[in-house]
C-alpha cells in the first residue's frame, strides 16, 4: 500500500508588538524541535502579502510522510518537547492559533520552473 503524504497547515497571528519575538521563537526554537520528528519531511512558513486583516498573517506547512506519521506526531517525544518549549516560552498569550488542519495529498504536478 502506497503511503499518502499529509499536509498540516497552521495559521497564526501574533499579538501587536510581538511579531519579531514570535518569528525568532518560531524559526529558531519551534521548527528545529518539530523537524526532529522522523516522519516530518519538511516545514515551510509563509507570511501574507501586504496589509490584510481578513486572514491570518502566518501559515506554517508541516509535511508528514504518511497519515501514520502524522498520527504518531501528537504522542511523540518530539511533540512533547515542542509543547513544553511553547508553554515555557509563552506563559503569556502572545499569539493566536487561528486554525490547524490536515489534508491528504491527492497528486503533485511539477512545472518547468521547478528547482
List PLM regions with ranges:
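Macromolecular interaction modules
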Residues: 1-115
